[in-house]
Amino acid sequence: MRIVIQRVGHASVTIEGEVKSAIKQGYLILLGVEESDTSEDVDWLVRKVIGLRVFDDENHVMNRSIMDVNSEILVISQFTLFASYKKGNRPSWLRAAKHEISVPLYEEFCKKLSDALGKPVGTGEFGADMKVELLNDGPVTIMMDTHNKE
């Protein structure tokens, strides 16, 4: 699994002209699922996201987690995170998991994240054409990959 976490002042996702989810301060997370991903990958990412300390403390040091600041999370499915561009200029998404693998893992990630956060997590709609709007805060943008745990 691969995610891009962006610390945001606010974010929303619109589908067919209607806002599906919106958050205030927190994280916008783009989530890509690979064929070999499992529930263990979900658990690792949830622990990392919840524990990540990228919100400022009283000394303006990034020392607080999403739990510490009681913020919100919006999760958007993003198969293009697994783009391969080795050959030519048109990306290939062969590494991205098919729906029967990616949808259950996306839903599991959102549910476990919501359970850990103690409140609902905003979501997009898997496979839909979405318009995502955000105000990047910082900017703080972090990538995580369960197959490259750095």
Go through the PLM ranges and name each one:
Residues 1-89, 97, 104-150:
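N-terminal, polar/charged subdomain of small-to-medium soluble alpha/beta proteins
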Residues 93:
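Glycine-rich, phosphate-binding/catalytic loops in enzymes
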